[in-house]
């Protein structure tokens, strides 16, 4: 199986994820050169990485998280304090691009193509696009708007988890 990891450079101020993702993919690929058992199935982990640059987007968005935006609020992660960090429609933008890529792959190969988004519950209160309701509506719009969309699976495995849950899963996988 081949996994394509995708990150987006949309002019975000916090760059560490973009800086570290390539070395993480290299680490995973070198660690899992041999097959591993996942849910009773033998899997060869091959990960390709693509960074998609959304040049110019940050200048059009009103958010403290993008270059040219206000200062990122400090202090308690309270709803009112952190609303300035909402990047309008960010997860929809990402999902639309990833859905289009997955559908293109499915059409080209004739095989099912699954996507998994890292949207997580820790952000529900502040970011409306981190909720099950949003994910379901997004999936519905994708299915209505595309022929062959049944060939694309859409997973949000951390929608009920937080960043700590993601970290724990990563640690468990690295131990295996």
Language model features with spans:
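Nucleotide-activated chemistry modules centered on ATP-dependent adenylation/adenylyltransferase
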Residues: 1-176
